[in-house]
């Protein structure tokens, strides 16, 4: 049982920006951590749903902005950095070694910024239009 608790807190500490109540690492619980990842996803989804409930009475654009931002904030923008790196490299239209160099570069290029803006606008508009189809939108989450 202890390995399951350790595994959950290890997954939490690794994939969420929310401070973990217990900073644990156990090699024996490492496999349990992988099994606990869906629980961490449910935690993110629960926070997301809670944020949506908190802003129910707010104007539509505010609700949409909060719903688009919450998963990024909760996960510490984890996957967003990789998304931007890939957009920078793929859209550069260069040879393979140059693309690899772009992937390793810590600076943010124009393609990354453009793709981030398009992603944010797409999510915002999805949540803005989802107010009339709330239950269908919740099924997507």
Model-assigned labels for residue ranges:
Residues 11-15, 69, 103, 114:
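Short alpha-helical scaffolding segments that buttress acidic/His motifs in well-ordered protein cores
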Residues 17-21, 56, 131:
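Short helix-capping/hinge motifs at transmembrane helix termini and TM-loop junctions
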Residues 19-24, 78, 97-98:
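C-terminal ends of transmembrane helices
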Residues 30-48, 89-140:
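Multi-pass membrane catalytic core of lipid/isoprenoid biosynthesis enzymes
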Residues 35-87, 135-140:
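Membrane-embedded alpha-helical segments that form the functional core of polytopic membrane enzymes
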């Amino acid at each position: 049982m202890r390995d399951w608790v350790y595994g959950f807190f290890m997954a939490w500490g690794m994939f969420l920006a929310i401070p973990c109540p217990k900073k644990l690492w156990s090699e024996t619980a490492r496999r349990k951590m992988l099994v606990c990842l869906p629980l961490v996803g449910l935690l993110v989804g629960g926070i997301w749903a809670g944020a949506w409930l908190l802003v129910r009475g707010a104007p539509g654009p505010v609700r949409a902005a909060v719903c688009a931002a919450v998963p990024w904030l909760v996960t510490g923008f984890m996957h967003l950095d990789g998304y931007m790196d890939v957009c920078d490299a793929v859209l550069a239209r260069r040879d393979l070694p140059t693309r690899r160099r772009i992937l390793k570069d810590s600076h943010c290029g124009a393609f990354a910024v453009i793709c981030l803006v398009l992603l944010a606008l797409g999510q915002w508009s999805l949540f803005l239009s989802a107010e009339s189809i709330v239950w269908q939108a919740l099924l997507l989450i």
